[in-house]
Every structure is written in structure tokens, then in C-alpha cells.
Amino acid sequence: MPVSLSTALRVVGTSLFALAVLGGILAAYVTGYQFIHTEKHYLSFGLYGAILGLHLFIQSLFAFLEHRRMRAERQPVRLGRSVALCIAAYQEDPDYLKKCLLSVKRIAFPDLKVVMVVDGNGPDDTYMLDIFHDVMGSERAGSYVWRSNFHARGEGETEAGLQEGLAHVQALVRSTTYSCILQKWGGKREVMYTAFRALGDSVDYIQVCDSDTVLDPACTAEMLRILEADPRVGGVGGDVQVWRRGGDGTHGGTALALVALTPSPPQILNKYDSWISFLSSVRYWMAFNVERACQSYFGCVQCISGPLGMYRNALLQQFLEDWYHQTFLGTKCSFGDDRHLTNRVLSLGYQTKYTARSRCLTETPTRYLRWLNQQTRWSKSYFREWLYNALWFHKHHLWMTYESVVTGFFPFFLIATVIQLFYRGRIWNILLFLLTVQLVGIIKATYACFLRGSAEMIFVSLYALLYMSSLLPAKMFAIATINKSGWGTSGRRTIVVNFVGLLPVSVWAAVLLGGLAYTAYSQDLLSDTEVAFLISGAVLYACYWVALLTLYLAMVARRCGKRKEQCGLVFAEV
């Protein structure tokens, strides 16, 4: 069969499958078909709930199978390949940057080239260059303060000076083991482009890393193992995890005892700094070890995260210019860099994978507003890249199509459900919905406790409320402002508070409170049965929160603020 005809058939088939999935979910939602229900429908179980439950079960099953496959991996790592680690830095907290660079020096991989590019070349940025020299060693490190960047001249820069700077940056990066470039501000994508362009085809693989990331010594070798094992894989991402300290304070076992096969507890650098950073840590674990692990089973991980990822350089150089010059609705894109990098790999028909054996620590916002801004930025890139990703459904497993449809449209179904319940239902319907949300959260949390082997994962169920109250309106706001660009969150050295993110949350809260008041006012008098259900449901809901908050105070709150223990890692020591 001709290639063009085969491709056309796959496009048609995949498109029909996507429409069938969406149509099936929509039909189940609209018809409201119920398998079982009590008299007057106080309790019921319908087709729509069954579909969502089946989705969670299948996703969890394939995630489990992928973890089992990861643990069984025994193929030796070929250390003869050349790898460059590219670090993107912007107004980084000095302590985080130092920890990042110290962990880089401890990576167990021979002749690893390190390129750090700083987004900014002013007096307020030079402290990062000083830290780079202090940690990496001035005798092996080269540096250059560039007045320009690859796409914009610095103030007073001539064309000849620009070309001289370009040549100097490329020569420096290719000739030195450790190099640090300070360049004219241009955003994270500009920083990444400089590192990729300067390296050219001088290495086989490129590893990416953010300046707030602490890397496990085996992370590079473990990602390389995946890429070397299958030429169809174009990129691989790792996990945010902790490697346990050995009893003598050295690496627990051999240097490439390679991330113990028994799952150790994932963590974030500032996990216990606040309630929001703690909940983010358990959410990160679910995102990586369930959602992305499932995607990895089918070779279609849709986002290789910036803190820890590796790509085939030959592929990266192939789409570098298209990646950098990406536009959306006529506007140049300057966020979603990592997701679009992953999408470019997928667009070429290559697989993307995830390995829990490659680990790192990263920083997450500790304040609600900064976290909200971060989530809004990520949601913008998700919806924009969803449209781009849909162009390549036919090149990959049907799971990629199915999951994209389900996760892409789920927020809209959820909003429609909430508004309908709050404005057209009864008080009991609203309470039952809240109970159902938490029940699903508890089921997911129980599975996470089993998979990870940690009781802390029970707090995944708390994240459900955060999703309903904050993430849902943030996603809608992200769609409304999808073309507004920027880093989205400020640098960590100077935190800038942005109150814009509160607008959609406030509007959403007003909508819900208004609906609750309207329903309470307009509904008929409650029957004795409904009163009994309301009292029972309210008591059950209150008991749930009392139990979870008690556990939180006992297990988590007492540790908040004790950042010292976060540095007690083999690869995070200072």
C-alpha cells in the first residue's frame, strides 16, 4: 500500500476514533443513563460514572505494568555516547542553584558536558556566574557575558560584534567541559535555543535541566539506557524522587546501584515548606508515576518536563528552528517550551518514554498565588499544545488519541456538571457530588499508597478540592488569555506577587455560592427521607475532613518549615 494512502487511512481512522470517544462520553453524559438508583434517585450509579471509573482503572493498570517493566530492565548502559546537559537559569535562588550544580558534578557519567545559559546579562545576574565558577571550578569552566543573544542585538551592538559573539559562544560551548553563558534577556525558550544551537551536532544526546533541580547521580545513565534500547524512542523524561542515603553517608551501594528498584518516596526540594508545596508533591507523584507511566507504556508521553529530560540530538537539531519560531494565532509562543519540544519529537513519529529510575528533586511554589500563576501558565501550554498534538494522533498508538480526548474535554464536562447541580439540582445533589469527588480522590489515593508504599499519598484526596476550587477556573482563564506570554512565574530570587490569578477563582466562587443560595431558596420543602440523607451525608463529609486534617496535622504540619531535612540527600549535600 502506498505510504500516502496508508497515512490518509490512519488519519481518517484516528479521527473517527476520536469522534467516537467524544461522542460516546457526550451521549453518556447527556442521556444520564443509570444502571441502578434508589427511589427518587437519592443515590444512583450511571453510565457516565462507569466510563470515568473504567478510565481510571485502565490508566492505573497500565501504569502498574509500566513500573513492573521498568524494574525488570537489566540492559547495560553504553557509556561511550556523548551527552550534554543544558541548564536554563533565570533569577535563581542562590541556594537552589548551588545545590543544582553540586548535583551535576556528582552525576555518574563520563565526560558529561555542561552548558548553563542565564537569561539576563546585567549586574543582578552575575551572581549566578560566580556560583557556577565556585562550584564547577574555574580551571575547567569557561564563561562569556554576551551583550546579545541569537535573535536580538544588545544595546550598542554592531552586526560585526553580533557575529563575533555568535562564533565565540559556539566555540566556547564546544571546546570546554563546563560553560556558562550570560545573555540578553529573551525568555526561557531563547535560553534553551542558545544551548542547543551552540552545541550543534557535537554530541549524541542532549539532557535538559532547570536551575532549581537537584539531579540523582544515575539520572543521565538511566535515561540514556531507554534511548539506546530502542531507536524508535526520541525522548525520555524522568521522575521527581529521592534517593535514600546509605548508612555511612555515601551513595547507598554502588554509584550506579542505579536507583533502587523498590520505589523510594518522591519528594520536592521544598516539600514541607507549606501546605501548597506538600500537596504539589503528592500531585507530582501521581502525574509522573500514574499518568505519564501509563502514557509511557504506549510510547506517547505528552510532556517531558524541563527538570529532567533527554533527547536525541539529531532529532532536536532537525526541528530546532521550527520549535523556536512557534506561533499561535499569529503570536510568537514563549511558554510551554518543554511540552512543545516533546510534541516536536512526537510529530516526527518517534516515541517518548518515561522512566522512574531516573530521578531528580525540584522546587515548587510555596504560596498559593504563585502556584496559581504557575498552573495557569501550564494550562495555557496544555490547551495550545493539545491542538498541535492532535495533528499527529495517527502516528502513534490509539491510547494517545483516547487519553487526549478524555483529559482535554473533562474540565468542560465537569464545569457543566457543577453548574447544573448548583442551579438546577437540590441541596442533596450538591452534597452527593462533593462526597463523590472525595470518594474518587480516596480511591486514587489508596492506589497511590499501594503503588508507592507510603501512607502520605492518602493526601492525594485533598488535591481534589484544590482542583475543583482553583485549578478548574484557572484552566478556563488560561483559555481566555492563551496568547498572553511570559515566564508566568517570577524568578525565585525576587518573588513578584501577581493577583490576576485570583480573578477567575473569585468569579468561580461567586458562581458556586450564588448557585447554592439559589438552590436552597427555590427548592421545595425537604422530605423526611431527604433530611435523613442530608444529615448522614453532612456527618460523613465532616468526618472525612476531620480525619484527613487530623492526619495532616500529625504527619505533615509538624514537619513544615523544617527545610534542613530536605538537604539530607546524597546528591543534595552542600
Swiss-Prot record:
- Which family is this protein grouped under? Belongs to the NodC/HAS family.
List the record's Gene Ontology CC terms alphabetically: cytoplasmic vesicle; Golgi membrane; plasma membrane
Q: How does it sit in the membrane?
A: Multi-pass membrane protein
Could you tell me which InterPro entries the record lists for this protein? Nucleotide-diphossugar_trans
Q: Its Gene Ontology biological processes?
A: extracellular matrix assembly; hyaluronan biosynthetic process; polysaccharide biosynthetic process
Q: Which UniProt keywords apply?
A: Cell membrane, Cytoplasmic vesicle, Glycosyltransferase, Golgi apparatus, Membrane, Transferase, Transmembrane, Transmembrane helix
TM annotation in the entry: 16-36, 45-65, 399-419, 430-450, 457-477, 495-515, 531-551
Q: Pfam family of this protein, just one?
A: Glyco_tranf_2_3
MF annotations from Gene Ontology: hyaluronan synthase activity
Can you name this protein? Hyaluronan synthase 3
Q: Which reaction does it catalyse?
A: [hyaluronan](n) + UDP-N-acetyl-alpha-D-glucosamine = N-acetyl-beta-D-glucosaminyl-(1->4)-[hyaluronan](n) + UDP + H(+); N-acetyl-beta-D-glucosaminyl-(1->4)-[hyaluronan](n) + UDP-alpha-D-glucuronate = [hyaluronan](n+1) + UDP + H(+)
Give the Cytoplasmic compartment stretches of this protein.
Answer: 1-15, 66-398, 451-456, 516-530
The protein's role, per its UniProt record: Catalyzes the addition of GlcNAc or GlcUA monosaccharides to the nascent hyaluronan polymer. Therefore, it is essential to hyaluronan synthesis a major component of most extracellular matrices that has a structural role in tissues architectures and regulates cell adhesion, migration and differentiation. This is one of three isoenzymes responsible for cellular hyaluronan synthesis.
Q: Which residues does the entry place in the Extracellular compartment?
A: 37-44, 420-429, 478-494, 552-574
Q: How is it modified after translation?
A: O-GlcNAcylation increases the hyaluronan synthase activity, HAS3 stability and its plasma membrane residence. The concentration of UDP-GlcNAc controls the level of O-GlcNAc modification.
Keyword Transferase among record annotations: yes
> Which cofactor is recorded for it?
Mg(2+)
Listed pathway(s) = Glycan biosynthesis; hyaluronan biosynthesis
> Could you tell me the EC number(s) of this protein?
2.4.1.212
Location in the cell reads: Cell membrane; Golgi apparatus membrane; Golgi apparatus, trans-Golgi network membrane; Cytoplasmic vesicle
